[in-house]
């Protein structure tokens, strides 16, 4: 081993033993060039370091190995990274969260290129758990995990990291990029869409769209298109975006989504044949955007919406009559829709198989059972917790030096502009 590398190993050992993590971070940041020049000796360096005791030193070596233009032996490197992430010291790597996250990004990109996304899911879950200060903290690795789950069509491993509400962002020593925030909510929205949890999907797309921005982001544009479609499926109309949405959405993103606005406009007429014509007209656009599946679900949701409207007019109706009123192909298709809607709790009805008549019923829920009271209690607890969090955040902002300085400055400006009451 070259003397400079020996010195690096000795310094890593010494600083780790002394617990001087800040100085150790400075060392590994300076040593990138040295490690890159001695690529053939890096496995020897890894052998001289203990993953648990010298986590930051091992991290630096693996990061450099992955940064090379071509990885000579990917399988060996993959095994080394897998072992490192599962056994490294979480307290140590939190001093170099930027490098640790960077290693995870490199691993993700390599697996995406090799079309092996499934292999990285378990590793990234461990990485997030090591890096997070708490379960409500968002890291840039969250977006990587969601991307791999989407590509592998294996959604459930991501759910524990999507079902929690994020209250904090890991700064990653200033390396956290807005792209990771947008990707987390965009990919998360796609996962929820795939699982047909449209309510949560809509929330995730909204987070991506309403992210403060000064320029158009392609991720925000794609989120906006899916937001329109999921809105129609879930609510039967496009949900209005909050007032704090950036002006670029109205100025630039909306004009780039004309086909989707036309779709929403035609959807509001409740006419399935017109909607089908519009889908055919813009089929190339919807297919190019990979949204044709969602568009078809919009058409299906319009049929359901029209069936729901019939429940407000009729007590009983034949399947044949329903099919003609809703513009379905025949009584068989009408029966299929009604059965699915009964199963999903979208309507309350029964079908008489003898005469093909559908009888509509009132909602049997009386809202007086223990389960309903438990749900109300849970919702109230969430509201209390949210109120406490808001108070804590308000207090945090109130004592923030930058906020105090700005508010004092604005008060001085106001007092300076007021005419004196004494003459």
From Swiss-Prot:
<protein>
    <recommendedName>
        <fullName>COP9 signalosome complex subunit 3</fullName>
    </recommendedName>
</protein>
<dbReference type="GO" id="GO:0007165">
    <property type="term" value="P:signal transduction"/>
</dbReference>
<dbReference type="Pfam" id="PF22788">
    <property type="entry name" value="COP9_hel_rpt"/>
</dbReference>
<dbReference type="GO" id="GO:0043516">
    <property type="term" value="P:regulation of DNA damage response, signal transduction by p53 class mediator"/>
</dbReference>
<dbReference type="InterPro" id="IPR055089">
    <property type="entry name" value="COP9_N"/>
</dbReference>
<dbReference type="Pfam" id="PF01399">
    <property type="entry name" value="PCI"/>
</dbReference>
<dbReference type="GO" id="GO:0048471">
    <property type="term" value="C:perinuclear region of cytoplasm"/>
</dbReference>
<dbReference type="GO" id="GO:0009416">
    <property type="term" value="P:response to light stimulus"/>
</dbReference>
<dbReference type="GO" id="GO:0005737">
    <property type="term" value="C:cytoplasm"/>
</dbReference>
<keyword id="KW-0007">Acetylation</keyword>
<feature type="domain" description="PCI">
    <location>
        <begin position="197"/>
        <end position="365"/>
    </location>
</feature>
<dbReference type="GO" id="GO:0005829">
    <property type="term" value="C:cytosol"/>
</dbReference>
<keyword id="KW-0539">Nucleus</keyword>
<feature type="modified residue" description="Phosphoserine">
    <location>
        <position position="410"/>
    </location>
</feature>
<keyword id="KW-0963">Cytoplasm</keyword>
<keyword id="KW-0736">Signalosome</keyword>
<comment type="subunit">
    <text>Component of the CSN complex, composed of COPS1/GPS1, COPS2, COPS3, COPS4, COPS5, COPS6, COPS7 (COPS7A or COPS7B), COPS8 and COPS9 isoform 1. In the complex, it probably interacts directly with COPS1, COPS4, COPS8 and COPS9 isoform 1. Interacts with CK2 and PKD. Interacts with the translation initiation factor EIF3S6 and IKBKG. Interacts with ERCC6.</text>
</comment>
<comment type="function">
    <text>Component of the COP9 signalosome complex (CSN), a complex involved in various cellular and developmental processes. The CSN complex is an essential regulator of the ubiquitin (Ubl) conjugation pathway by mediating the deneddylation of the cullin subunits of SCF-type E3 ligase complexes, leading to decrease the Ubl ligase activity of SCF-type complexes such as SCF, CSA or DDB2. The complex is also involved in phosphorylation of p53/TP53, c-jun/JUN, IkappaBalpha/NFKBIA, ITPK1 and IRF8/ICSBP, possibly via its association with CK2 and PKD kinases.</text>
</comment>
<dbReference type="GO" id="GO:0006511">
    <property type="term" value="P:ubiquitin-dependent protein catabolic process"/>
</dbReference>
<dbReference type="GO" id="GO:0008180">
    <property type="term" value="C:COP9 signalosome"/>
</dbReference>
<feature type="modified residue" description="Phosphoserine">
    <location>
        <position position="407"/>
    </location>
</feature>
<feature type="region of interest" description="Disordered">
    <location>
        <begin position="402"/>
        <end position="423"/>
    </location>
</feature>
<dbReference type="GO" id="GO:0005634">
    <property type="term" value="C:nucleus"/>
</dbReference>
<dbReference type="GO" id="GO:0005654">
    <property type="term" value="C:nucleoplasm"/>
</dbReference>
<dbReference type="InterPro" id="IPR036390">
    <property type="entry name" value="WH_DNA-bd_sf"/>
</dbReference>
<dbReference type="InterPro" id="IPR048621">
    <property type="entry name" value="CSN3_C"/>
</dbReference>
<feature type="modified residue" description="Phosphoserine">
    <location>
        <position position="423"/>
    </location>
</feature>
<dbReference type="GO" id="GO:2000434">
    <property type="term" value="P:regulation of protein neddylation"/>
</dbReference>
<dbReference type="Pfam" id="PF21215">
    <property type="entry name" value="CSN3-like_C"/>
</dbReference>
<dbReference type="InterPro" id="IPR000717">
    <property type="entry name" value="PCI_dom"/>
</dbReference>
<keyword id="KW-0597">Phosphoprotein</keyword>
<comment type="similarity">
    <text>Belongs to the CSN3 family.</text>
</comment>
<dbReference type="GO" id="GO:0001701">
    <property type="term" value="P:in utero embryonic development"/>
</dbReference>
<dbReference type="GO" id="GO:0000338">
    <property type="term" value="P:protein deneddylation"/>
</dbReference>
<dbReference type="GO" id="GO:0045116">
    <property type="term" value="P:protein neddylation"/>
</dbReference>
<dbReference type="InterPro" id="IPR050756">
    <property type="entry name" value="CSN3"/>
</dbReference>
<feature type="modified residue" description="N-acetylalanine">
    <location>
        <position position="2"/>
    </location>
</feature>
């Amino acid at each position: 081993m070259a003397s400079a590398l020996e010195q690096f190993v000795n310094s890593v050992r010494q600083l780790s033993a002394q617990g001087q993590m800040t100085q150790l971070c400075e060392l590994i940041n300076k040593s990138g060039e040295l490690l890159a020049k001695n690529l053939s000796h890096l496995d020897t360096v890894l052998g001289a370091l203990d993953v648990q005791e010298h986590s930051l030193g091992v991290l630096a070596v693996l990061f450099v190995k992955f940064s090379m233009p071509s990885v000579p032996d990917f399988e060996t490197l993959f095994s080394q990274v897998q072992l490192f992430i599962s056994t490294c010291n979480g307290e140590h790597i939190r001093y170099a969260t930027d490098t640790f996250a960077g290693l995870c990004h490199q691993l993700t990109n390599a697996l995406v290129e090799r079309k092996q996304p499934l292999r990285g899911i378990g590793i990234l879950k461990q990485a997030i758990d090591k890096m997070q200060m708490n379960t409500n903290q968002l890291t840039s690795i969250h977006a990587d995990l969601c991307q791999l789950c989407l590509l592998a069509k294996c959604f459930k491993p991501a759910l524990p990291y999507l079902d929690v509400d994020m209250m904090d962002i890991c700064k990653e020593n200033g390396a956290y990029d807005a792209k990771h925030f947008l990707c987390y909510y965009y990919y998360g929205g796609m996962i929820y869409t795939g699982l047909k949890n449209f309510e949560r999907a809509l929330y995730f797309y909204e987070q991506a769209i309403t992210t403060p921005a000064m320029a158009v982001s392609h991720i925000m544009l794609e989120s906006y298109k899916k937001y329109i479609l999921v809105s129609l499926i879930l609510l039967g109309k496009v949900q209005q975006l909050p007032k704090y949405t950036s002006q670029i959405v109205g100025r630039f993103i909306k004009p780039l989504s004309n086909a989707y606005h036309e779709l929403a406009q035609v959807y509001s007429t409740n006419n399935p044949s017109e909607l089908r014509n519009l889908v055919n007209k813009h089929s190339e656009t919807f297919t190019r955007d990979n949204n044709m599946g969602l568009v078809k679900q919009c058409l299906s949701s319009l049929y359901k919406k029209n069936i729901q409207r019939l429940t407000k007019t009729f007590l009983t109706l034949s399947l044949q009559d329903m099919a003609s009123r809703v513009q379905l192909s025949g009584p068989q298709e009408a029966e299929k829709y009604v059965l699915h809607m009964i199963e999903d709790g979208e309507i309350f009805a029964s079908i008489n198989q003898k005469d093909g008549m559908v009888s509509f019923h009132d909602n049997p829920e009386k809202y007086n059972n223990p389960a309903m009271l438990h749900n109300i209690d849970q919702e109230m607890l969430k509201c209390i917790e949210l109120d406490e969090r808001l108070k804590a955040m308000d207090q945090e902002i109130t004592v923030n030096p930058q906020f105090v300085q700005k508010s004092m400055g604005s008060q001085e400006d106001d007092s300076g502009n007021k005419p004196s009451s004494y003459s």
